[in-house]
C-alpha cells in the first residue's frame, strides 16, 4: 500500500502553488499525494502555467497527469501571485497544522512542504519562527533541522536565531540533543548502522585551544566525549573552514553545524536545486524544499520544481520505511 503524503504549498502568493501543480503533472508510483491548499489558488496557478489540474476528493487516487487529491484550506482573500497578503496567514498555518494533525493521527504517513514567508505570517498576527519549530511544538518532541543534497547532509544545533544569540544557545543539552537525534535518524531513516558524524566547532579554527573562544573546551568537547562513550561515532570539533573539503567529506555521513549560516552556504553552493530540508525527530517524515517563496517568479511559469520533486521522492522513501 502506498504511503499517503500531505503536500502543503506554503505561501499562496509565492511559487509553492505552481510547483504543486507541476508535480501533479507527473504520474507517480511511490505515494498518494493530498494537497492541503486553497482550490482557487491551485486553479489560478494552473491557469498561469497553461496546465490543467483536476482536484479530487482526498480519498480518490490520482489516475492521470493533472489529478490532485485535495484537502481544501480556504483563504481569507484571493491570491495575487507575487503580492502576499497577511490576511492569508491563518490559512497557511491551518494547512501545516491540519497536515501535521493527520500525520499524528495515523491518517497520513508524511508531509512535504513548500516555502513559507515568515514575515507575512507574523504580519498576520501569528507568532512564527519556522515550520520546523511549529511541527515540533505540535508533536511535543525535540527535533533537528537537516538539509541535504547528493553531496552532503548538514544538521543544525541551532536554527533561526540572530547571530548574537547563537553562543548562548550552544549548551551541553542542545549539542547532545542534536547529536542523539541526528544519529538515531541516520540509523532509522537512512539505514546507516554506525553513522560517522562530523561536528563543527563554534569559533574560528574550532577555538584554537581556547584562544578564540572557550565553547569548544567547555561545552562541545565534553559532550563529544560523553556520547562517544555511548557508542556514537563523532569526529571533531572541526574547524568549519576546512571541514567541507571533498577529501574530508568522504569520511563523514553527515556534518553537524552549530548555527544556520555556518553549514548551509556550502550545502547550497554544492547543489541548491536538489537540496531538501528534513525534520529529524518527528514521529513521521517531513521533507521541505530548500528555497524561499521567490515572489518575483510567482505566476510566471519559470520556477524550478527540482527541490519539490526531490523532497517528495525522499519523503515517500522515508514513509515507506515506516
Task: Label the model's feature ranges.
Residues 123-145:
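Glycine/threonine-rich beta-strand-loop-alpha-helix active-site module
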Residues 134, 145, 154-156, 286:
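Conserved hydrophobic/aromatic beta-strand scaffold that supports enzyme active sites
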Residues 76, 141-144, 148-151:
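Flexible glycine-/small-residue-enriched beta->alpha junction loops
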Residues 1-131, 172-258, 262-293, 298-322:
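Contiguous, glycine/small-aliphatic-enriched amphipathic segments in soluble metabolic enzymes
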Residues 147-177:
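Ligand-binding beta-strand-loop-alpha-helix segment within the catalytic cores
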